[in-house]
């Protein structure tokens, strides 16, 4: 099969996801409001704290809002990966998935195209969040807006693949919505998104190992150090 056919298929799937995202305005606003609520309310509760140290020997502190911003970026990608997979379950129940499966394009290419389309949408959400987060004085270096892109692609692929795996195992829409919340919140809270690992190690050793082996922690840390060019 010619390469142009694959490219047209990929373009069609990406445009379909982009149009769905544009038409679902509540999805866009919820994707931004959710991390902004965390940033505006949760960070305000820790504003009295001098800061958080993340680089050994843990003597240099940064504001807490600056610390949790990468974790909130990863949260955007986590929710978007799950919601993109939720749309797959919806398409399967409504029967629209059959129109894609009857095409001569291999199914693995359809899945990869769907995954990359979700990553593209999540990156748009992240950059929109970074623009609004500047109101909280979260302004990374100019180079950070470029160096964060590979980290966003890798973490988006990882989190999107997790959601796609769940959507392939769970056939009903209602069951997937429940399992989605069961997966999202433990992954988010048991990571370095809100607290540095060395602080967690001081308070609970078993929780430290849970956070250390949590794949979401590595997504957060890759985003953090690429965003701030460190």
Regions found by a protein language model. Give the residues of each.
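Short, membrane-interfacial amphipathic segments enriched in basic
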Residues: 1-15, 206-217
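Hydrophobic transmembrane alpha-helices
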Residues: 71-81, 179-190, 207-209, 213
């Amino acid at each position: 099969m010619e390469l142009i056919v694959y490219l047209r298929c990929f373009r069609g799937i990406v445009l379909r996801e982009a149009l769905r995202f544009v038409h679902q305005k509540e999805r866009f606003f919820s994707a931004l409001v959710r991390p902004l609520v965390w940033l505006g309310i949760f960070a305000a509760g820790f504003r009295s704290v001098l800061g958080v140290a993340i680089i050994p020997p843990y003597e240099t502190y940064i504001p807490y809002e600056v610390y949790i911003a990468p974790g909130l970026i990863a949260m955007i990608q986590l929710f978007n990966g799950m919601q993109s997979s939720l749309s797959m379950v919806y398409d399967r129940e409504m029967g629209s998935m059959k129109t894609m499966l009857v095409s001569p394009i291999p199914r693995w290419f359809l899945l990869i195209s769907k995954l990359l389309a979700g990553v593209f949408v999540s990156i748009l959400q992240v950059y929109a969040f970074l623009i609004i987060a500047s109101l909280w004085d979260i302004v990374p270096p100019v180079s950070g807006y470029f160096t964060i892109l590979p980290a966003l692609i890798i973490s988006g692929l990882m989190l999107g693949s997790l959601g796609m795996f769940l959507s392939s195992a769970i056939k009903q829409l209602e069951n997937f919505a429940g399992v989605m919340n069961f997966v999202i919140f433990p992954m988010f809270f048991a990571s370095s998104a809100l607290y540095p690992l060395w602080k967690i190690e001081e308070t609970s050793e078993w929780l430290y190992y849970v956070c250390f082996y949590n794949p979401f922690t590595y997504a957060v840390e890759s985003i953090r150090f690429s965003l701030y060019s460190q």
